[in-house]
């Protein structure tokens, strides 16, 4: 074999060996990657729907890095699938309520840029609670705050912050609204936002940050909604809306919404005569609301919503210690569970209550005539026995010398049960405090507890003489 042939032979053998090594390396790489990906493969949903790993549903952002012959392969482990809330756990057993949050918005407004608001409420997603309110399009230390006692102007917007964070200049304006409701279905937020002319308002339904549906006024007389959280069960959210007279017959309808789309509308049925500003809570498998009768009754209407068949029933809270303001004194007040009591029914205030077996927990102003003070208590038999008046576990939330306002309920799911919480609106400014030209509020929040608790009073606390005019 001559030298040239030797060179060719050696080169061919080397090339063959190199090719074999290269193919083996590829085989090893493919096998390793296949085994690695198979190990962390996510189970597909039963309906074979594509489940993208979007930031809004990732609970833990874990990355696996595997080094193979100087090649880096990254694969994100699929997160736990997010499910609709069903609220099927039992209601927590409580002995009363413990302090939870206070935002001190009015006190902070004396030296900072804080929004002028009213109609606040609280609602929670599966991991965190938020406070909402209807802003007046201005901060308090601003001449635009003059005459903000008016409810419906085109500049009002729904504000949203983490609970305990006052509505500062960086606060998100969720939508245009002078009446609203919000709730989280387990996957995303739904906001119901009403704005427009009194005789031809529009309700916009915003889901996951996008406008999905809308509905116009059906009675041409101030379309309005709850001013507290709506409730979603297995992807169906319910919201109570009223259009019509505030001191006479009105048209109340219950809307059923799925991912922002109206799927059904049911008229109010049952014995309730007038229903506004409902405070709703999940009562699996349905939704229960305690509302405001602004026409005939100082006892509060109850609206029961069947999420499965869209049926509605209504009546009144049985407790003879009634929850609205104004009202008769406790010795002369009445409720027969079925009808309005025709006791100082016109005007009223938003409030709440919830059933506990045959009993009822409730909150109300301490004053029977005005929005002053705030108290909570349990009425034995107050859910099932007409005119029951046996009161236990009374607590003062705001003493009678200080102003209160609207109040409402929200629910929080723990590992074993569903807790009930409430907020109280602490109104300041006009009409009562005429030194200033504005009207605004702060809030205080309490939640149910199975423990012991003390006493106190948690008013707004701002010195009106130190406030901007």
UniProtKB/Swiss-Prot annotation:
Residues 31-469 are virion surface. It catalyses: Hydrolysis of alpha-(2->3)-, alpha-(2->6)-, alpha-(2->8)- glycosidic linkages of terminal sialic acid residues in oligosaccharides, glycoproteins, glycolipids, colominic acid and synthetic substrates. Keywords: Calcium, Disulfide bond, Glycoprotein, Glycosidase, Host cell membrane, Host membrane, Hydrolase, Membrane, Metal-binding, Signal-anchor, Transmembrane, Transmembrane helix, Virion. Residues 326-350 are annotated as: Disordered. One of its GO terms (cellular component) is virion membrane. Its cofactor is Ca(2+). The chain crosses the membrane at residues 10-30. GO terms for molecular function: exo-alpha-sialidase activity; metal ion binding. It is found in: Virion membrane; Host apical cell membrane. Its EC number is 3.2.1.18. Gene3D superfamilies: 2.120.10.10. The influenza A genome consist of 8 RNA segments. Genetic variation of hemagglutinin and/or neuraminidase genes results in the emergence of new influenza strains. The mechanism of variation can be the result of point mutations or the result of genetic reassortment between segments of two different strains. Homotetramer. Belongs to the glycosyl hydrolase 34 family. This is Neuraminidase. The gene is NA.
